[in-house]
C-alpha cells in the first residue's frame, strides 16, 4: 500500500499515489474546516493515535471508543446481549474505504491516518458538498462502495498479493519501460464494471478534486487497471446492522452523547427498531437480491425514498472536531476558581459550543399517541422534509403538536372537522390498522401522509408556478411505514393539475380523500360515480365512519395526479418538459401497469400538526414595521374561542318577536327549526369544498 508510484519520465520528479492522497487531504482540510476545527481534530487524533514504524493511525477499537459506537463481538446479530447495537465493524469498514478517496483501486482499505481521517469526516458529514461535483449523487456512490462487502476477496490475502505485485512491478519499470504507472490493486469491488444502469463513472467526482494536483492521469490509470466486470453488493446483514444503528441515533445532536441512544435499550424498543428495519429491507424485495444489495437497488432506495438516511453520521463524526482537552470554557472556569481575584475572560465566539438541550419533537398535551413513537419518528426523519434550509426534522427543531386522535376524540367526522379544519399549518396524518389477506391472516399496517398546506386550503396550489422546481418541504407525500417501506413523493407539477384534483378533500358523504380525482357535483350522481377516484401514483380514501381506509398505489395506470409512482423522485420528475411527458414516463415504469389496493381496518387515526422551529416568527409587513405572526396553536385556540362565543351569542338572541307569550314560543320554535337554538343547533361541521 505504501509502494505505489508514478514515473513521469527520466529526470522527472516521481510522485507516489500516497503523496497525492495526502496533498488532497490538505486541500480538503483547508476548504472544509476552520483553523479552530483543525486544531481540535489534531488534538483528538494524535493524543490517541497508535505508532507503528513512524505512522500514526487509529484502529477500530480507538474509533469506536471515541465516537461511542457499540463494538460488540459477533457478526451474526446486530443487537448485542447487553442491549447495545453492534455497528463498530460496519462503521470502520466504511471509514477504511473512504479514507482512500479517490484512489480506491490502489489504496482501499486504507490505514486510518490523520490525512485519511480528514477525508472521512468531509465525506461522511454535510461538508461533502464542497468537494463532490454532483453532491448527493456522488456521495451515494461512495457510501455504496464503503458498505459493499460481497464480491471482495479476503482483505488479508488481497493486501499480501498487492504488496508482492507492487514490488514486482516497481522492479520491472524503468526509463525505457512502456509501463507508465505502477501500483498495487485495491478492493476488487472497486474495479470498473460495465453497469447497465446508465450511471456515469466515478471519474468526475474525483477529477474535480485532482485537477489542481497534476494527478489526473494517475487517477485515470487507477481506474483502468482492470476492465474485468466484477459484481459487488452489500450483504443484507451489514445493511441491517447499519439501519438499526442509524434508526436509534437519528435524534443525535452535535456533541451529544451517543451512548444515550445505543445502550440500555428495552426489549420493546429493540423490537420496534427491528420492525422498522425489516420494513425498509422489505422495500428492496430481498427475494430478488441473491447474495446482497446491488448498486442500482441501493441508489434507487436512497434517492427516491430515504434521502436523509445517512444524516445521523454528520453529528456523529463532528465529535472529532471538538476536543475536551482544548475546552477553553472549562479551563478558564477552573482558573477562576483557583484565583478568586482573576477577572472572567469572555470565551471567543469561535469556540465550539456545547450541544443545546434537545427540545422534544413530540409535544405533550391533547392525547397520548397510540401510533407515533421515537422509532417511528426516526423512520419519518429519513425521508420527510419540513423546511428547505434544513430538511431533517431533528436538526431543524420541528415540533409535532397533537391535533386529532380517533381514540381520544372519537370516530366522527364532526370531531375531525372541529380539530383538524381549525389547524392552520402543515400536518401529518397517521393511520394504524390491519390488512386481511386472502388466507384470513391479519397484518399490522401503518400508513400516512405529509400535507404541507392546511386542510382548508387544499386546492390553493395554483400559486406555485409550474416552471419552478419546489423543494420537498412544499410538496405532499404519501407513505407506508410498515410492513413495507414505500414513499410516494408529491408531483412537482401540482399547479398544472386540474381543479378537481386537490391534495385533500373532505365531505360528510364520501369521507376523506387524499390525492384523488373528485367527480363534479350533480344531483344525478349516485353510487360509485359519486365517490372520489384514484389518480396518479397513489391515493388514500377514508370512509365517513373513519373505520376503513383504502390505499391505492399505481405504477402509472391512473395517469397524472398529486403523487408520483413509487421509485420516482420529485427532482427527476421536474425534468419532464410537460405533464403529458411526465404522465407518459410514469406510465412506462412498469411493463405491466397495475394498481395495488389495500383495504385497512382502522385501529387508530391521528393528525399531528407541524410547528416550525420558531413558533413566533417575525416577517416584514410594511417598510419600517414588523408584525408578529401567531403560531398555529394560538390560532386554533382563538378559532375555538370565537366559535364558543358565537354559540353563546345565538343562545341569548332575543326571542320575543311579539309582545305576548304565544309569540315568544312561536319565535323560539322557529329558531329551533332553523337549528340556531336548542338540541338541534348547528354543530359547526365544515366542508373543505
From Swiss-Prot:
Residues 173-201, 332-359 are annotated as: Disordered. It is found in: Cytoplasm. Its main location: cytoplasm. Residues 343-359 have a biased composition (Pro residues). Keywords: Cytoplasm. SMART domains: TLDc. InterPro entries: TLDc_dom (IPR006571). May be involved in a process influencing telomere capping. Belongs to the RTC5 family. This is Restriction of telomere capping protein 5. It comes from Paracoccidioides brasiliensis (strain Pb18).
